[in-house]
C-alpha cells in the first residue's frame, strides 16, 4: 500500500531547470569520486537476465521480478533485474580483475512489488559496484574503511552542491558512526527496526548498521537479505555476526532516517552453504551462479549499490524521489504532493 510522508512547510529550493542541472552535476561528480576512491572502472550492465540461472537479486525473497518471453530463444523467459549483486561478481571473474580493483555500473531496475512512498519507486537507479579483495580483507575493519571512503565521496559531493546552489545548506556530519544491528537492538529493545534506525540516525546524523540479514537475539532479523551475496553469518567483531550493512543518514526534510546504500563483503564458499541452509534454500546450490562460486571460479569480493536518485534527492533537499526521477505514481499521491509543493516528474 502506497504511503506519503508529508514534510512540514516544504518548499523546493530549486526550480525545474536547476533541479535537472543539479542531478546531472551530482551524478557526474559522485561517480568520478567513487571510481577514483575505490579504483573502479565503468562497465556496461544488463537490464535483464535469463531466468533460472540464479543471477538476479532476490532482495528479501518475496518480491516478484518482471518477466517476459524471448521469441528467438524458444520463449525462454528473461527477468528484469532487481539489482546486479551477483552479476557483478561473475563480471569480475570474466574481466580478470585483480585484488584492489573493481567495476561500477549504472544499474536500472524495475521493482514491481515496491510499496510506493517518498523514497520508494517502481524504478530503481543505482551505482552498482564490486571490487576484488583478498581473504585477509574479509574483516569488519576493511568493511569500515571502505564505508568511510564512500561516505567521504558523498560529503565531497554535498560540498560541491552547496557551493553551486548557496540556498542549499550542508547537513551531513563529518564522520559516519558504526553500530551493529544487535547493539542497536540492545539500545532500543522496545522499538521496531525502523524506529531504531530513526533513533540512531537522529542521534549521529550518519550511521552504518552492521549485520543485516541474520537473526538477532530477539529471534528476528533487523531486515531481510538474500542468502547468496552479502555475508551476514560470518563472525565479525565482539562475537557479532555479519560482514555487511547499510549506510543511513538522518534526513531533516522528511524528519526520518534515509538509506543511501546497502553493501557488504560477499559470501565465500563456506558462508554461502551456511546461509543457504539457514534460509532453507539449499536447492539453489545447483544454479549457475552458485556452482561457479562453490567451484571457486569467482573471486572474493566486496560490493554494493548506491541510490542515484536517492543521493540527488538528499543533496538537493527534495521531499519526494518523484521530483528527481520519472516513474508511475498513484494519482492521489501526485495530487497530494502538488498541494505540498512537491511536483512529481
Where do the language-model regions lie?
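N-terminal pre-domains immediately preceding structured catalytic cores
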Residues: 43, 52-56, 168-179, 330
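Extended, charged alpha-beta segments that form solvent-exposed binding/catalytic grooves
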Residues: 105-199
Amino acid at each position: 500500500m502506497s504511503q506519503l510522508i508529508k514534510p512540514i512547510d516544504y518548499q523546493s529550493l530549486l526550480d525545474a531547470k536547476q533541479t535537472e542541472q543539479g542531478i546531472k552535476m551530482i551524478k557526474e561528480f559522485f561517480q568520478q569520486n567513487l571510481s577514483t576512491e575505490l579504483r573502479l572502472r565503468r562497465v556496461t550492465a544488463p537490464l535483464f537476465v535469463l531466468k533460472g540461472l540464479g543471477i538476479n537479486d532476490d532482495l528479501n525473497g518475496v518480491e516478484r521480478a518482471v518477466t517476459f518471453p524471448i521469441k528467438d530463444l524458444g520463449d525462454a523467459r528473461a527477468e528484469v533485474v532487481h539489482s546486479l549483486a551477483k552479476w557483478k561478481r561473475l563480471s569480475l571473474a570474466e574481466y580478470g580483475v585483480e585484488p584492489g580493483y573493481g567495476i561500477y555500473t549504472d544499474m536500472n531496475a524495475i521493482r514491481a512489488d515496491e510499496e510506493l512512498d517518498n523514497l520508494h519507486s517502481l524504478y530503481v537507479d543505482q551505482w552498482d559496484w564490486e571490487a576484488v579483495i583478498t581473504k585477509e580483507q574479509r574483516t569488519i575493519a576493511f568493511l569500515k574503511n571502505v564505508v568511510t571512503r564512500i561516505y567521504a565521496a558523498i560529503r565531497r559531493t554535498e560540498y560541491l552542491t552547496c557551493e553551486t546552489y548557496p540556498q542549499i545548506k550542508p547537513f551531513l556530519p563529518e564522520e559516519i558512526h558504526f553500530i551493529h544491528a544487535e547493539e542497536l537492538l540492545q539500545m532500543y529493545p522496545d522499538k521496531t527496526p525502523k524506529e531504531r534506525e530513526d533513533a540512531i540516525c537522529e542521534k549521529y546524523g550518519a550511521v552504518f548498521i552492521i549485520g543485516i540479514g541474520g537473526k538477532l537475539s530477539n529471534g528476528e532479523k533487523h531486515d531481510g537479505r538474500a542468502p547468496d551475496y552479502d555475508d551476514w553469518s560470518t563472525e565479525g567483531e565482539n562475537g557479532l555476526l555479519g560482514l555487511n550493512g547499510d549506510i543511513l543518514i538522518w534526513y531533516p526534510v522528511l524528519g526520518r532516517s534515509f538509506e543511501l546504500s546497502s553493501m557488504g563483503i560477499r559470501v565465500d564458499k563456506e558462508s554461502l552453504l551456511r546461509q543457504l541452509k539457514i534460509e532453507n534454500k539449499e536447492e539453489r546450490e545447483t544454479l549457475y551462479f552458485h556452482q561457479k562460486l562453490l567451484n571457486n571460479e569467482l573471486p572474493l569480493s566486496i560490493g554494493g549499490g548506491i541510490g542515484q536518485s536517492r543521493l540527488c534527492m538528499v543533496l538537493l533537499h527534495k521531499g519526494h524521489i518523484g521530483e528527481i526521477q520519472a516513474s508511475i505514481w498513484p494519482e492521489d499521491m501526485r495530487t497530494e504532493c502538488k498541494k505540498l509543493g512537491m511536483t512529481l516528474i
